[in-house]
Amino acid sequence: LVSLQGLGDRYPHQLSGGQQQRVAIARALVCKPRLMLLDEPFSNIDTQVRMKLILEIRTLLKRQGIGAIFVSHSKEEAFAFADRLALFRAGHIEQVGEPEQLYRQPQNRFVAEFLGGVNYLAAEVVDSHCVQTALEVICGHEPHGRARGERLQLMLRPQQLALAAAADGDLLVREQQFLGHHCRVLVECAGQMLEASIGEPLEGERARVTVAPHALVLFEQMS
C-alpha cells in the first residue's frame, strides 16, 4: 500500500526520511480514519523526494477515501497537496478557496504576495472591464466592479507579462536570470521596475509587453 516491500526487518534509523513518513502513514491507516491531520510532515525531507512523496500520499488518501487537513508553511507543498487552501495570518483566516483561485484572485495584498511574485501598477478605471496603466490599456474578461475614473493599483503576476524583444520597444531590459524552467526578467517602464517570467531569454536591450485578458485584481492605493 505504501511501497515498503522488503523493509520490514529494518530499524527506524535504517530508513530514509521518506520511508519513515510512509511508515507513519501506514500506521495511521490501520485505524481506518475518516480524517487525518498532517502537521508539517515533510519539513525534514529533501526537496525532490518531498514533492514525490506528497503526490504519493495525496493519491493514496484519495484512493482510500480519507480526508486530510495538511498544515504547512510551504506554498509549494500546499499547492501540490490541497484541493482547497485556507491561508492564515496571526491566527486568522485571510482567504479560503481552491489553490488557483487564491493565486489568481487574491482578496488582499497579503494573500497576493504570500503566494507568489507580484507587480503593482497604478491604474485608472476607463470602463467596466478595462484600466489604463503605464503599459497599456489592460482589460479583464469579466466586470471588475469599480467606478470609472477610480485610481487603484493593478496586480499582475510575472507570468502574466508576455515580453518580446523589440528595438523600438517601450521597456528597457535591466536584468535577466536563466533559472532552467523559466527566465526571470526585470524590465523598466516609466521609471518602475517590473518582473516577468518567460520561457527563453530575450535578445537586445528593449522589449514590448502584452497582457492577456484575465480577471483583473485591483487593490486600493497604498496610503
Where are these regions (language model features)?
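Gly/Ser/Thr-rich helix-start
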Residues: 18-19, 98, 113, 117-118, ...
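ABC ATPase nucleotide-binding domains
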Residues: 1-108
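C-terminal boundary and immediately downstream tail of ABC-type ATPase nucleotide-binding domains
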Residues: 3, 104-127, 155, 212
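Non-catalytic connector elements of ABC transporters
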Residues: 118-120, 129-223
